[in-house]
Amino acid sequence: MKKKNRIKKNDEFQAVFQKGRSSANRQFVIYQLDKETQPYFRIGLSVSKKIGNAVVRNRIKRMIRQSITELKDEIDSGKDFVIIARKPCAEMTYEEFKKSLIHAFKRSGIKITNK
């Protein structure tokens, strides 16, 4: 993901948590905040230490980033997203992972067609 598409600062994360709305499935929680003046979307990732060691957490973050890269043309611009991974996603294959992430986006109201 490009630098402009990332949320890194704590106050930006807190703004999405406090002012945004959330939706979830068993593997992910997605918070989203509308930013009409922003011409692109931004993604922040959160993977808790409860999920596993650093190797497992980094693998999950890489799979989320890869999924977002493949779906970037279908995600609405002008929004900030924070994706929180839950424990069940640690044992998933990439195909199951991507399908679950698409399902979580659809639950949050983002229309994504599964290619």
Swiss-Prot record:
Gene Ontology molecular function: any one: 3'-tRNA processing endoribonuclease activity
Q: What is its EC number?
A: 3.1.26.5
Q: Fetch the SUPFAM superfamilies from UniProt.
A: Ribosomal protein S5 domain 2-like
GO biological process: any one? tRNA 5'-leader removal
Q: What class of enzyme is it?
A: hydrolase
Q: Where is it found, in Gene Ontology cellular component terms?
A: ribonuclease P complex
The answer to whether the entry has keyword Hydrolase is: yes
KW tRNA processing (keyword) present: yes
Query: InterPro entries in the record, alphabetically?
Result: Ribosomal_Su5_D2-typ_SF (IPR020568), Ribsml_uS5_D2-typ_fold_subgr (IPR014721), RNase_P (IPR000100), RNase_P_CS (IPR020539)
Pfam families membership: Ribonuclease_P (PF00825)
Which reaction(s) does the protein catalyse, per the Swiss-Prot or TrEMBL entry? Endonucleolytic cleavage of RNA, removing 5'-extranucleotides from tRNA precursor
Mind listing the UniProt keywords for this protein, alphabetically?
A: Endonuclease, Hydrolase, Nuclease, RNA-binding, tRNA processing
Q: What does this protein do?
A: RNaseP catalyzes the removal of the 5'-leader sequence from pre-tRNA to produce the mature 5'-terminus. It can also cleave other RNA substrates such as 4.5S RNA. The protein component plays an auxiliary but essential role in vivo by binding to the 5'-leader sequence and broadening the substrate specificity of the ribozyme.
Family per record: Belongs to the RnpA family.
Q: How does it assemble?
A: Consists of a catalytic RNA component (M1 or rnpB) and a protein subunit.
Q: Under which name does UniProt file this protein?
A: Ribonuclease P protein component
- What is the originating organism of this protein? Bacillus cytotoxicus (strain DSM 22905 / CIP 110041 / 391-98 / NVH 391-98)
Taxonomy of origin reads: Bacteria, Bacillati, Bacillota, Bacilli, Bacillales
